[in-house]
Amino acid sequence: MKHRTIINIFTGLALAAAVAVIALISIILTGKSHLYNAADRIVQGNNCDGDKTNEAVIFNREPYVYKKGLINILILGIDGEGNLYDNHSPGDMGQSDAVYVVSIDTQSKATHVVGIPRDTMTTIEMSDKDGNTVAVNTGQVTLQYGYGQDIQQCTSLMAKSVSGILYNIHIDRVVVLSVNSIAIINDAVGGVTVTIENDFTDESGEVLDEAFVKGNTIHLTGEQARLFVQERDCNVAESAMDRLSRQEQYMQALEQLLYKKVRKNPFLIMKIIKELKSNDMLYTDMTNAEIVYVFFR
């Protein structure tokens, strides 16, 4: 009887594991289908601003055309410590201090990340409290996010601006993270190791952390991670570019670590997403299946 019970337990565990694997495969395939369909649709169509994506761009007298089968995901990091879903007057919705486009090649499976400096000058649409465009000016791309009526319009305006900066590429999906999300993501993967390339302080000139000394290699935990990717001295020229370099270093290290962790535990990414969403630190139009596929493609 005892032997039979043990066999039943192992059989049950094996069935549960098989069901979990099948469910995971189903999720991955669903995510793949959704993203591939998005990539296929825009090859024949227009970008988010209605401009053709298949027209040649001339650079150094050489013509370049949009490559087929790319999935472009816009990632925005928003300053301020408030709720991403809080509605404010247009112009007060915050600024996007981190602007990145992650481009996934569905043919080669390669991933390319393009960081756009927050101070890049572009066309900025300003809207009223009803979401209607009332003015179009030239300004820093970081400002565009703040002129939406709500988070959906904020991200739509940013997608349009970034698309224009990058020769009208199509933006397929958007991921928006509040600055407070960094500590949660960082600690969920056990911390991220970085090297301090330059000394930096906040705008008051105070040292943010004793470990933030040029040349130090440190393992960031919690609040350290947020300080590393967010803070800069606004009174120092090129401090925004220095911060962009830190953000890129952090993102590369985090991507590699998160990829390894999620491959071992597929449900980790779902746990992180659930915590971020429950605290209103994440907005995205990606489905859970699409997010899981990104890590298992």
Model-derived features: positions:
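Non-catalytic, solvent-exposed segments at the cell envelope interface
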Residues: 2-15, 20-297
